[in-house]
Amino acid sequence: MHKNRYDMRKENDGSWTVFDIFTGLPAKVKGVLQDGLDMEQADDLVDLLNYLDIKRREETHR
């Protein structure tokens, strides 16, 4: 069972941040912090980043 690395949280201004659960810091994609998102964007991005992270870990353990 793989533990998801990324999750999302609602900020005080109503926007959403995708963050790394191990560091608590906002995720970066191509150097851009993933904050100020709407809920749908954040939810889709969490799914994508977790999928890519799981694939990366599977490849390194082969």
Specify the residue positions occupied by each region the protein language model found.
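Short N-terminal "domain-start" leader segments
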Residues: M1-D20, L25
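Non-catalytic signal-transmission and effector/linker regions of two-component phosphorelay proteins
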Residues: D7, H61-R62
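Generic ordered-secondary-structure signal
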Residues: W16-T17, I21, K28-D35, R62
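A short, charged, amphipathic alpha-helix used as a generic interaction element across diverse proteins
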Residues: K30-T60
